[in-house]
């Protein structure tokens, strides 16, 4: 129920216009409030036994997840990123606002210890470190910064899903309590 952001799931995601249609939700939208309520219940059950973390995808990853996991279209995210970078940046900013709201509520209203924050390079040669930082990184960092203000226990996960390699240097300024990456995919242990 929570894996898809509503304005991403209800969107054809075919062009820049579709990316511009992605808008933030009201703070009392069920996509936010129901996650908080669910995590309140879960952390009540387990937080006295183990540390509790919640998987949070970085802003534009919600778009990639929709396209790859739901549509099974493994090329369209890169197509959109290459052909509509400013529109993707807009979508990331809008999604980032909701993710910040969600993270703030989760880390202040539940017994979560931190978030497990998932990032991944845009798998395109057009997205060098400078472009990534400008189009994607600013909004990723805003979420992580907020999480770090609320908890010292956040985990940065550099996702190697489907054996997509990442330039780990892109994340050298991403401060977290712990780091996780795909050891075999990245070839770094």
What are these regions (language model features)?
Residues 5, 27-189:
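Active-site loop segments of alpha/beta catalytic cores
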Residues 1-24:
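A contiguous, low-structure linker/loop signature
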């Amino acid at each position: 129920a929570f894996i898809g952001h509503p304005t991403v799931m209800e969107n054809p995601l075919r062009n820049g216009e579709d990316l511009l249609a992605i808008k933030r939700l009201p703070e009392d939208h069920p996509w936010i409030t129901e996650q908080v309520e669910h995590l309140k219940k879960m952390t009540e059950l387990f937080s006295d036994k183990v540390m509790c973390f919640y998987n949070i995808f970085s802003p534009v990853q919600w778009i990639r997840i929709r396209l790859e996991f739901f549509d099974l279209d493994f090329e369209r995210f890169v197509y959109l990123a290459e052909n509509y970078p400013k529109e993707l940046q807009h979508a990331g900013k809008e999604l980032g606002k909701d993710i910040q709201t969600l993270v703030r509520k989760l880390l202040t209203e539940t017994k979560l210890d931190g978030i497990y924050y998932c990032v991944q390079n845009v798998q395109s040669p057009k997205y060098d470190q400078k472009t990534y930082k400008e189009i994607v990184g600013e909004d990723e960092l805003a979420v992580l910064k907020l999480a770090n203000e609320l908890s010292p226990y956040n985990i940065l996960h550099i996702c190697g899903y489907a054996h997509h390699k990442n330039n780990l240097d892109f994340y050298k300024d991403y401060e977290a309590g712990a780091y996780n990456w795909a050891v075999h995919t990245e070839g770094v242990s």
